[in-house]
């Protein structure tokens, strides 16, 4: 469910989960489309795998940082062992009716133990950061775990192997209410609007995702290029040409400059879907380089109170990374070298 909805919002600017239990109330997204896209990922398992360092990353810095964290973990492990020994000793010293608490610690030691456990967890998380990982598709063996008290559904074809021969629509989103079968696919409305070839997706394991990826970046797809351009525009101007970058549906906002959105989408595809080139085009444009001060502020405030005409550059809220880099830059502590500790 999460993968289907994330793909829908990121590349198609549609919240797919709205069509999980019923046809979308505001957009032409039937339930069949939702389960068709979900069928693309029905044979997919995600896992964390170790990845190699990038060429520009500083392995030496990562090694030093990992060593520092390991030394902290060792120190806390030692403190924890000392506390455990103290607990054993105090348990042996119980006399009369005055018993030691359940854990054998006084309030001060309890606070120390809590601090040690919290720091151990924090440093182990920090240690994970220095190990490059990637979220990839798991292709190993699947261990099936079952709840012995749960409801048992006998498979229709017990010896079917490799991949599901069919996926179904769950009526009302209930996994126990199986409805019509559905084939892997994309959004039918996008195919009809863009004149795309509505070829059925292959059923083979691994081929479904490739088919969806090709469908998403098809030049006839009326959504993807516009969605990506609108999203990148919003990074630089604080808002997109079409409002919410994740909502191109009926509840979203109409584009303020539809011709510009179409032009940039066409330019984006003709330039190999290069985000770097699109960033360069936007950042070197007269629109982006305009001052936030207009020579006639009263007139522009009356004619364009929301700044939708881009007669001046409206200040936008900085993200955390930009604030961090700005503070390091003005203090002279920014390291311009690529790679190293994040």
Question: Which residues fall in each region the model found?
Answer:
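Sequence context surrounding c-type heme c attachment/ligation sites in exported
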Residues: 1-77
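Primarily short, surface-exposed interaction patches in extracytoplasmic proteins
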Residues: 28, 64, 71-342
